[in-house]
């Protein structure tokens, strides 16, 4: 595996530079580089100078031109404003105007959105798409009531476990020192049900922790794992997909509402045109990242059918446990209803 470091770097450079979608599907445009009295300050964990940011900058230039620079964005990239919870806090205090988030960050504003990421609830990304489309309008209204504009949905990708020892059973997972993203209530509940003592920390701390051995296992999409260089410190990944990561960009409503009707129409049209392209790009890059890891020496361990079934039963128990804590019974019922609709097609 270590003989493939050159390949790792080459692959992680091209793929990692395009991982913006892991954080939010980021449908807002990046900074146009031109100052404006109404310039929006948007924070993201995505790296500056990446190929993905270059694409978004082209779009930002287009928006700036169409609005005569009345609408511009300034991105604070690479986590310089902190982890997602830090950005949320700064938004509430007026330090930031918006952020590009995974569902972990989004749930700091509206916890119920995590109902879309329940463990083992979807059998495919297409199934998730169908349910998400049916429910996204509800989440947009909930965010608006709390003073935020939730934009179009983005993808993080299929979530797998990555480790330095093969994980074929829940017992194997219990033996590992597994990362837990801060106090993520959903993953924490799943880990508790399995009997895993997660090691809580923010995303920027994961790679150093893998380096020192503080943790020896983590979870995420292939694209995130390559982009963040985690895969250079692990040897195995599970074939099982436990969930499909959801993301989006959020803007403070008071900032959004300052736009004129004309500019609002232009911005909405631009965001809409980029939404599908970004989701498509993230899905393609997740597949490329998966292949790149395998070429670099990471071994994919086929998850036994009995283990998948065990995780499914554990997941179903967690769905019920989190009712009233993250989302309502009605929210869960709607997810299951729309899932059944899709499966009946």
Predicted regions located by residue number:
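N-terminal secretory/targeting leader peptides
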Residues: 37-127, 135, 139, 143-345
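Low-complexity, intrinsically disordered segments with a bias for serine/threonine
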Residues: 16-21, 35
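N-terminal secretory signal peptides that target proteins for export/translocation
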Residues: 1-16
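Short linear Ser/Thr-Pro motifs
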Residues: 31-32, 67
């Amino acid at each position: 595996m270590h003989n493939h470091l050159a390949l790792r770097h080459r692959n992680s450079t091209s793929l990692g530079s395009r991982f913006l979608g892991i954080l939010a599907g980021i449908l807002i445009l990046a900074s146009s580089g031109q100052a404006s009295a109404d310039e929006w300050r948007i924070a993201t964990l995505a790296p500056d100078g990446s190929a993905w940011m270059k694409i978004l900058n082209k779009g930002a230039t287009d928006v700036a031109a169409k609005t005569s620079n009345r609408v511009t964005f300034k991105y604070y990239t690479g986590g310089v404003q902190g982890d997602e919870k830090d950005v949320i806090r700064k938004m509430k205090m007026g330090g930031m105007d918006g952020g590009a988030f995974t569902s972990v960050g989004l749930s700091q504003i509206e916890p119920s959105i995590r109902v879309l990421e329940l463990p083992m609830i979807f059998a495919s990304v297409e199934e998730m798409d169908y349910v998400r489309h049916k429910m996204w309008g509800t989440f947009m209204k909930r965010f608006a009531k709390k003073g935020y504009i939730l934009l179009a949905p983005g993808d993080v990708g299929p979530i797998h476990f990555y480790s330095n020892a093969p994980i074929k059973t829940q017992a194997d997972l219990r033996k590992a020192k597994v990362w837990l993203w801060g106090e993520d209530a959903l993953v924490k509940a799943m880990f508790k049900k399995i009997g895993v003592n997660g090691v809580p920390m923010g995303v920027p701390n994961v790679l150093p922790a893998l380096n020192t051995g503080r943790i020896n296992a983590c979870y995420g999409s292939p694209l995130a794992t390559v982009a963040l260089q985690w895969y250079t410190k692990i040897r195995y990944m599970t074939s099982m997909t436990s969930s499909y990561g959801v993301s989006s960009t959020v803007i403070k409503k008071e900032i959004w509402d300052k736009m004129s009707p004309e500019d609002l129409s232009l911005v909405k049209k631009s965001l809409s045109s980029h939404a599908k392209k970004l989701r498509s790009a993230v899905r393609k890059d997740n597949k490329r990242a998966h292949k790149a890891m395998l070429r670099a020496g990471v071994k994919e361990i086929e998850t036994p059918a009995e283990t998948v079934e065990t995780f499914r039963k554990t997941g179903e128990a967690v769905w019920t446990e989190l009712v009233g804590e993250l989302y309502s019974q009605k929210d869960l019922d709607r997810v299951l209803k729309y899932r059944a609709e899709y499966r009946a097609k």
